Amino acid sequence: MPPKSTEPDYRPSYLAAAITSLVVFSIYLATLAPSTAMWDTSEYISAAYVLGIPHPPGNPFFVLLGRFFAILPLGALSVAVKINILAALTSAVAAGMWFLITERILVNWLPERWQRITGAALAALIGATEFTVWNQSVVNEKVYTVSLMGLAIISWLTVRWSDDPDGPKADRLLVMIAYLLGLGYANHMMGFLAGPAVVVAVAVRRPQTFLRWKLIVISVGALLLGMSPFLTQPIRAAHFPAINEGEPTTWNAFLYNFNRGQYGKPALLDRQAPYFDGQLGMFWMYFRWQWLRDVKVQYPAIQSILAMVYMLLGLMGGYVHWKRDRKSFWYFGTFMLTLTFVLIYYLNFKYGHSQCTAMGNPPDVNCEVRDRDYFFIVAFSAWGVWSALGLVYIWEGVASLFGS
């Protein structure tokens, strides 16, 4: 049944969302990388092509999906370009999901359908054209746009569930969400980032769900089924593909790969850089990049102004979201908190590479070997939803001043 709203005949504008996704996809295709690129790009393109195992944990869902794109009969396109198209397509689908979520939020305060579609299109286009999102969407540097798509789909399904948690489709939606969480984990650990927000949404909207053991068992089963691509790793490893990192042909080797044992991550309380000056400072640096980034020429003053405007728009949008649609805010607000402050704390990065460069590369400071803005691709993309809500709120205020 359609979610309850102030507009009884509300229907998600799937056609408008699809058109928006197509526009975003066209932008990415027009700027698509013609081949491979730096860092992990070649490793992952090659691993997908040979059904191999890239560095732990091996990202088996991406490998399977990438292999599918690698063998598509797309004329004379190289394997690299085909897999770059995968990045563009998955990111464009994510933009469509942000469109649907934004439109749903706006149902509670914009009476006209065209107004909601305009606001939703703004959210999708803003999120899709940020530096990190665009950069990852035109060359398959790794697995992050697949994670972005998965988390955006989970977000849309959770918003739909929150509208009618007692409806006939509610349990099926939760099982599907659990499956997608598991499948997302088989792509990258990032796929679990929606989990805490889903739990909060269920706890607020229908807490008795946690007492329904049959649904919980089925959901856990769906979660494990989603993670089943990991079972392909020992099979492929036994065939010794050209890329076979960790060679997980035994149970111990498989667990070592699955648990990312080679990285030796320090305890969370053992901070590799100060949380505020170092790690939050690194996030703010990456946030500043989103609307003005040039690898040759930097404009720190203009960057900071644009970033502050974008930050304030998002905070305004988040506040309006809380005031006007609590049902979806419980999920989306927790999701944004997880993608930012919680994720920054959990990742526990050293000083960012560009931070160290700006500090003159002091020998006594531990620095990351590269900039890792891609870990926050979902946060930057989803922030487009709140920034669009902020723009709509300003638009509404200006319109009221002129009596329209």
Regions found by a protein language model. Give the residues of each.
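Membrane-interface transmembrane helices that cradle and orient dolichyl/undecaprenyl
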Residues: 110-114, 137, 146, 154-174, ...
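Transmembrane-helix motifs of polytopic, lipid-linked glycan transferases
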Residues: 85-110, 153-157, 312-316, 385-388
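Membrane-interface alpha helices of multi-pass inner-membrane proteins
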Residues: 47-50, 123-124, 172-187, 199-201
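Aromatic- and kink-enriched transmembrane "portal" helix at the membrane-lumen/periplasm boundary
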Residues: 29-33, 76-84, 109, 113, ...
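Hydrophobic, aromatic-rich transmembrane alpha-helices
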Residues: 304-327, 393
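Perimembrane helix-loop-helix junctions
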Residues: 162-163, 194-224
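Loop-to-helix entry region of an early transmembrane alpha helix in multi-pass inner-membrane enzymes
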Residues: 60, 64, 75-96, 100, ...
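Transmembrane-helix signature of polytopic, membrane-embedded enzymes
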Residues: 14-19, 98-129, 165-172, 329-330, ...
